[in-house]
Amino acid sequence: MMLITTSHRPTRRTRSFGHDLERVFPNSLYLTRGKKTIQELLMEAYDRGYERLLILNVWKGNPLKMTFIKVHPEDWGYLGYLYLHGIKLQREMGFKGLNPIREDMPLVVTTAKRVGWDHIAFAQVFAELTTGKFVPRGDKSLTYIADKYDTDVIAVIERHPRGMVINFYRLDVTKDRPVGPLINVKIWIMEDGRRWDYKEALGIKVPRREKGEGQESSSENRD
């Protein structure tokens, strides 16, 4: 599915976040960044058969941004960015030591049952960024969806006062509650121009980002 790493000099919390994502993205791997460049990471991801490279960018000790990159030896490119309000790690949700999923199964992306069009649009975007499968929720239970698509892991887009959140369920662990990590998204930007900002959604005027501004200008956060 994807190779997961961080910007240079990550904090312990950001590394823990990367390991948590490895446990909910099927057949994915968290890799310590070290001194590797973007090009070296892309080649490693390609050699391992991954379609995506995910870089977790840090700001003031916490994960600030998730950068998704298409993996291809000749046609790689930035796909999109999630700007975060905050995260909650698996251990903070009562789950420690979960095993990564080392078998082929889809990451199903859906929504809570009563959400707006913004949440549905983001669920489709998140599926695109992760190579997951978007499934409209309707009145279906998560167990029904998991059984139908033969998977143990579902990402659910839910409401939040400051944006929206991604909650991960591992039905092989528990069918009663999410295992984490919980990701609070305040802005998402796609390279093709699609975007969403929770302040704009609330009618708060904010400076408009120019095309390509989603990419970091500093070498530490870009790389």
UniProtKB/Swiss-Prot annotation:
Disulfide bonds: none annotated. GO terms for biological process: rRNA processing. InterPro entries: Brix, Brix_dom_Rbsml_bgen_prot. Residues 1-196 form the Brix domain. GO terms for molecular function: rRNA binding. Keywords: Ribosome biogenesis. HAMAP family: BriX. Probably involved in the biogenesis of the ribosome. This is Probable Brix domain-containing ribosomal biogenesis protein. It comes from Pyrococcus furiosus (strain ATCC 43587 / DSM 3638 / JCM 8422 / Vc1). The lineage of its organism: Archaea, Methanobacteriati, Methanobacteriota, Thermococci, Thermococcales.
